[in-house]
Amino acid sequence: MANPLFRKHIVSINDISRNELELIVKTAAKLKKQPQPELLKNKVIASCFFEASTRTRLSFETAIQRLGGTVIGFDNASNTSLAKKGETLADSISVISSYVDAFVMRHPQEGAARLASEFSNVPVINGGDGSNQHPTQTLLDLFSIYETQGCLDNLNIALVGDLKYGRTVHSLAQALAKFSGCKFYFIAPDALAMPEYICDELDEHNVSYACYNSIEEVVPEIDVLYMTRVQKERFDETEYQHMKAGFILSASSLKHAKDNLKVLHPLPRVDEIAVDVDKTPYAYYFQQAENGVYAREALLALVLNATIEG
């Protein structure tokens, strides 16, 4: 069967079909179980981070090297021709893409990855463009859910914290809307509620969702608890303390959880997950971060049409 992801730009999670999502997730599972260190032998991948990153950049570069590829690029745009000499982003993309087989980029400007895809000679993978999209985070989230739940259909998923500005929860909701029977529980302050356009998309897909005031009231029903931080910089101190108070997870909050419940978080956390949760069987956020390597290995291998064993 032809590989539908070969040479495909990965700019938005909406660019990826359900079948393609399943292919990536199952390929990630294969690569986690059976390392294949020569999949990207003789391939050169650009890792161009115009904005600071820790987990995304390091996991991409780890994925490339574990598959036998070579990384070129930068983690700070301040010394590039773009910054020093006024070169346009389009020209930078055109030149860099002529050196490589695939192009991973993060940029603070919304829409930068889409622009890059119009000028690149090779597949562009969006490592985050402002508050817009972060599709590879969603891929590792889906892989972590699949790994712990055994499926991506008929799941009850709670999304907690900053649902207004958090690009990870937007993309995850959009991705899971492609699957059957999922139900969402939105838990957020009114000022940080899920945007209307996401709710409209869920309505279009006949996806069930409802809003709640606390984590404890939904814990007995859910399979996945996806935590995010309330961003302190968006509020004054008094308002922030009030906002975050009702959206902190502790071990005692999980006393009525189902056995299969897993707690996820895109990281970094601040204090929205108490450290006593780390030792519970429900905590999965550090394994989730590790899964970023396997999800990105799978994506790179597929867009470059590598022959995957197993």
Swiss-Prot record:
Reactions this protein catalyses: carbamoyl phosphate + L-aspartate = N-carbamoyl-L-aspartate + phosphate + H(+)
InterPro entries: Asp/Orn_carbamoyltranf_P-bd, Asp/Orn_carbamoylTrfase, Asp/Orn_carbamoylTrfase_sf, Asp_carbamoyltransf, Asp_carbamoyltransf_Asp/Orn-bd
GO biological process: 'de novo' pyrimidine nucleobase biosynthetic process; 'de novo' UMP biosynthetic process; amino acid metabolic process
A Pfam family the protein falls into: OTCace_N
EC number, as in UniProt: 2.1.3.2
Binding locations of L-aspartate: K85, R167, R229
PANTHER family assigned to the protein according to its UniProt record, in alphabetical order: ASPARTATE CARBAMOYLTRANSFERASE, ORNITHINE CARBAMOYLTRANSFERASE, MITOCHONDRIAL
Sequence similarity: Belongs to the aspartate/ornithine carbamoyltransferase superfamily. ATCase family.
Quaternary context: Heterododecamer (2C3:3R2) of six catalytic PyrB chains organized as two trimers (C3), and six regulatory PyrI chains organized as three dimers (R2).
UniProt name for this protein: Aspartate carbamoyltransferase catalytic subunit
Gene this chain is encoded by: pyrB
